[in-house]
Amino acid sequence: MITIDGAIQSDEITIACYINEVPLFLETELVRLYDTLYSSLPFFKVYRSTEQLSSYVAWCGNQPTTILLFKFRNGRIEVLNEMIEIDQAELDRFARYMFAKFSSANIISFKALKTDTHRFSFPIQKCYANDTYVITLPATPKEYTAALGKSTRTGIRYQMNKVVRDHPSFTSRFYVNEEIEEQHIREILKLSGVRISSKAFNFSHDEKRIIRLAKMCGLVNVLFIDGRLCAGSVNYRIGSSYFGAVMGQDFAYEKYGLGKLTIYLTICESIVRQGKRFYLGGGPFDYKSRMLGVQHEMDRLEIYRSYGKLMLNFDRAAKTVIDGYVRQLNVWLHKHEDKLGAKFVLNSYYLWKNLMKKDQQS
């Protein structure tokens, strides 16, 4: 490999690094490459700080093959891209380039990715980060409905017929981006918060950020009865992928299963709008499998310049291991949240999170 005008070139790959810069063309290229919310500029702008954000781009010919946005501070390169799959050769190339370019960098951190690290060039730590359930969408809503299990399909049809029979004014409407009414989102978040908090821990959504992101790439489904919002969901679209974010339903209409109907109607609408994938998010909820979601697990990855640097950062390495076990414990607790001991631990955890959030805001 040779260096030419600040870029590294091989026979097929050219690598460029834009320090404290995110070129405009990267927004569409990120969508083309990863097609995921958590590696998109709208998400970074709302949920991450874009100050002093730099860009790594590997080119094959005139087309990028890898784009990773990162921050470098205190000897650590923090990659913002999440929930993506990276080929090991690409990841190895990135690590070698970054350690060569930033001589004081000791660690490269990924929050959530899928990759093979067999015979990797550098010492690594790899532990469970999170998961998500993904539905591969067929060409039509009819095909999707037919693919559902018989009991799920029958249940949806029964609940839909029942709510229409009992409430002829029942309607489902979709709004995108600037069409979205902020009040609709607030009401959906409130309904969602009430349901989550009913499990005995105080919970609140980040309303401002959700509204801001929805205005940029949102798809909001609102269910009305007699002109009143009775259920709904906030979703996002990046490229050909849709992402379910928040779902809320009024307790008064619980017998109609409006939560399940909201999700089903949103998935069907995503298909109509040429969606290829629908992300149901993480968490061990049975309905996600029944709606044809397939679990995709992601790992946290820490890459060290050397074993010596790993030992010098032993405190961080230990924290990474502990965090991985805590995440796995959190998944187990949610699977068994009806048990008294698990419920107590979950309540304590969410109480601590809310106290930390208030402390950060004050």
Please give the residue ranges for each predicted region.
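Short, high-confidence coil segments that cap the C-terminus of an alpha-helix
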Residues: 53, 103-107, 218, 272-275
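N-terminal accessory interaction module
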Residues: 60-63, 69, 76-109
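A generic secondary-structure signal
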Residues: 97-101, 158, 162, 269
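Active-site/acyl-donor-binding loops of N-acyltransferases
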Residues: 2-10, 119-147, 276-346, 350-362
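Aromatic (often tryptophan-rich) hydrophobic motifs at membrane interfaces
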Residues: 95-96, 201-313
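A conserved beta-strand-loop-helix scaffold within acyl/acetyltransferase catalytic domains
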Residues: 2-76, 113-132, 146-255, 356-362
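Non-catalytic accessory segments adjacent to catalytic cores
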Residues: 90-136
